[in-house]
A protein has these predicted regions:
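Structural/interface elements that position substrates and couple domains in central-metabolism enzymes
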Residues: 1-238
């Protein structure tokens, strides 16, 4: 999707062997044909990267078994009652659990409530892998910050929050992302802290948009230009 494909291309451009996986066969076939439905990478760069040999794309689960570092970037929509739909995360955890081996790392990027990655994903991965958490494999969380359609603030240009289940995994995960993220990374003190930071980012943006929308409607009824108000208010330093 719009998170996974630019990330896969970015790592491949740095010489990393990347296997992009999606359960949606038509989507993978489109990418292999040089089509980028997300418009985040573009046909020219996608084709060039695929021809470069470092990036392969597949819908065949067995082909990702050889990987040792898994980054999961699945959506987290909401249900009709506005509760989070965690089925994509559950499904991805099952997929990872079926293919990981001892010594592997699993990093989730999906936007979730604090605690979900550890509460939900660990038991599922352990169940399907038969491997013991921390002893056999390590977990991390690094919230995606991509702004769809933004060609300035991209995966490579936005500082990345990273977290791990222990000091060793945090260091490993940080070094992986530092290979491609130009501004570097911020090492969060825990997975829950990283999850909470992402929730705050999204909430702050939504609150600001809603607040300004309300003000704009009020100002419009008063015959006041909202942009003029913002220009005036923006002269204060905070």
């Amino acid at each position: 999707g719009y998170v996974g494909i630019p990330m896969a291309v970015a790592f491949a451009e740095k010489g990393v062997k990347v296997i992009g996986f999606d359960v949606c066969k038509p989507k993978i076939e489109a990418y292999l044909n040089g089509e980028d439905p997300t418009c985040e990478v573009g046909t020219e760069k996608l084709v060039k990267t695929l021809k470069g040999g470092n990036l392969s794309l597949t819908y065949d689960l067995e082909q990702i078994r050889s990987a040792n570092f898994y980054i999961v970037a699945v959506p987290t929509p909401v249900n009709e009652d506005r509760s989070p739909d965690v089925r994509p995360v559950e499904g991805a955890s099952e997929v990872v659990g079926k293919v990981i081996s001892k010594g592997d790392y699993v990093v989730f990027e999906s936007t979730v409530y604090p605690g979900l990655t550890e509460e939900l994903c660990i038991p599922i991965i352990e169940k399907f892998s038969g491997l013991k958490y921390k002893e056999d494999w390590k977990l991390g969380y690094s919230p995606e910050r991509i702004n769809p359609g933004d060609k300035v603030h991209t995966f490579k240009t936005i500082k990345k929050i990273v977290s791990g289940c222990d000091a060793e995994s945090l260091d490993k995960i940080a070094k992986v992302y530092e290979m491609v993220v130009e501004p570097g990374v911020y090492r969060a003190t825990s997975i829950a802290v990283a999850e909470a930071a992402k929730v705050i980012e999204n909430s702050q943006r939504d609150i600001n948009i809603a607040f300004m929308n309300e003000l704009a409607m009020i100002f419009d009824k008063m015959g006041i230009d909202t942009n003029d108000v913002l220009d005036a208010a923006g002269t204060k330093w905070n």
